């Protein structure tokens, strides 16, 4: 707030009506009446003139006005409502929602409007309402979702990242050792995006339809000619699929992406993949490996190069740090991390969570790669190359 001696009484009172009692205390009556204010305006009564009339020290009076204004601003800050939207992986949506509601019940001072949807609801509305209209206010103060292309494309959410709208406020200085070691550094070095976990992609091999082929144990194996038209891919899961394309490109170039297209037999939802009998190999989120019987024709393979991951992002607006503080602490905390890791097999970045990966490697394309490439254009090129391979 800014108060100067030259401001008119009318402008002060109209902008800061909470100052009326302060004026009343020194004998100014009727300032809640527009007609009185207009008359003072016509007489060009400034704050300095008013204090001369009342024989008050203007320099001592201004802090009293500022205190009245500040007290109301503090009250306003205390009741501001934060907004949270999450698109959560289906297996953990309900337990996370229940945990959050319990947390809110224990912390009555948190004021938040929230909606935690299943991930299949999709992100199309963000492109329509937030990105195309360039209206970041349409996005919740906190937004949780996977979204590999959405968050890194400079024409999509990437443009808001460059403006410094988001800030990692989790306070986690070092990610879980599964994501911070000699092979992987997942934490955003620019401090814009925070993450709560990842969705790893693994293989399920149906040995009954290998027809003499060896069990593929690496991404490189899937690109071999013998696995042409033999693999189911989660194309409908755009986040994971785009992440797979980018990682294959980084490892094996556009030829590798085309070979992955050649390997495509069918495009199924992960839940359908478990029942599919034709593909020799299905690529799916690690969670669905729970459904594979220990004894049977199907074998769960953790790729030798590592499970390709699609991060679960948590975007928080820097301007809403105060309103989001306790919500950030919960969503980035160990309780949520344990739920992700144990109920969803989605490894958590929280340093104290024991992830269900048992030291097995995970593949992350890397921040240097992301910052040195136009990710939106690269994903489009990879998609085109994949389709070329699939059409052969």
Describe the function of each predicted region:
Residues 132-134, 140-144, 168-202:
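A structural signal for short loop-to-beta-strand junctions that line the ligand-binding cleft
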Residues 152, 234-306:
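Ligand-binding pocket segment of bilobal, Venus flytrap-like solute-binding proteins
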Residues 163-174, 294-308, 318-319:
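Short beta-strand->loop
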Residues 73-155:
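Early extracytoplasmic/lumenal segment of secretory-pathway proteins
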Residues 76-79, 322, 329-392:
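Extracellular/periplasmic juxtamembrane helices and adjacent flexible linkers that interface
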Residues 220-240:
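Short loop->beta-strand "edge-of-pocket" segments that line small-molecule binding or catalytic clefts
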Residues 202-209, 309-322, 339-340:
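A bilobed periplasmic-binding-protein/Venus flytrap-type ligand-binding module shared by bacterial periplasmic
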Residues 208-216, 250-255, 319-324:
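Short helix-loop capping/hinge motifs at secondary-structure junctions, enriched
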